[in-house]
Amino acid sequence: MFTSRRRLFMFLWPVLLWHLPVRAQETTAVAPTGTQIRWVTLHQLERSLPREPIRVVFDVDDTALFSSPGFQWGTAQYGGHIVTAGVSVREEDLASPEDRRKFREFWTRMNNELDQYSVKKWIADELVRMHKARGDTIYFVTKRIFTGSEKLTETLRKTFELPELQPVIFTSRDSKTPAFRRVEAVLSYGDSDGDIRESIAAGVRPIRVLRSRTSVNHEPTNNGAFGEEVLVNSEF
């Protein structure tokens, strides 16, 4: 009997964890700016939303998908000066035509093939389910480089069961602010500082999703530094 109860507890614990109120030590955590982090649970977030349907935007890498396998392969195949999971490398930054060719080749493969190795984040699945139940319209906006073709949209449609999903908006390293304004977003989810800053610039409520500690994107994140709410247990 004890063994059966223990197994049941171990099975249910991850589910229960997502619905626990924010712990005291989390509410007193300090952002890099010295201010307290505004932690929010999934349940609290849902209760804070307006009753009528809204338009929401998800970032892709490290927010909706754990896509590090593709970027890790790309770095090994093409070199770290060409492939990065962050936003620092642009085609015009590369010195040689060969490096620029490799750059475009990687992004073509990333957007058409390598997401077969990406894994949806559990928190993203929970968020998408919540927004679908509310009747909200969901968009995905990414700073990935667009090279003329992509299967990312179809991957996201299948992964999150969104058959009516509009094509992913690729900004090719440019700011997401115009895209947020164009779709008239009310809420956005992102893991990077750029996601948060550009959401604020567009007048959109930003929610910080924690980046996995095993992500190959090592660009610093200053969670809570912009006054944004940070989603509890969103690393997974």
What do the predicted segments below correspond to?
Residues M10-H19:
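Bacterial N-terminal signal peptides
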Residues T84, P97-R100, R104-Y139, F146-E150:
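Short, acidic loop-to-helix structural element flanking the phosphoryl-transfer center
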Residues F2-M10:
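Bacterial N-terminal signal peptides that target proteins for export
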Residues A185-F236:
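Acidic, Mg2+-coordinating phosphoryl-transfer loop and its flanking beta/alpha structural elements
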Residues F2, V22-V60, A225-F236:
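Non-catalytic pre-domain segments flanking phosphatase-related domains
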Residues R55-F58, L65, I138-T142, P167-I169, ...:
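Structural recognition of the beta-strand scaffold that forms the well-ordered cores
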Residues I145-R197:
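Substrate-recognition "cap/lid" segment bordering the active-site pocket of phosphatases
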Residues H43-Q116:
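Active-site neighborhood of HAD-like aspartate-dependent phosphohydrolases
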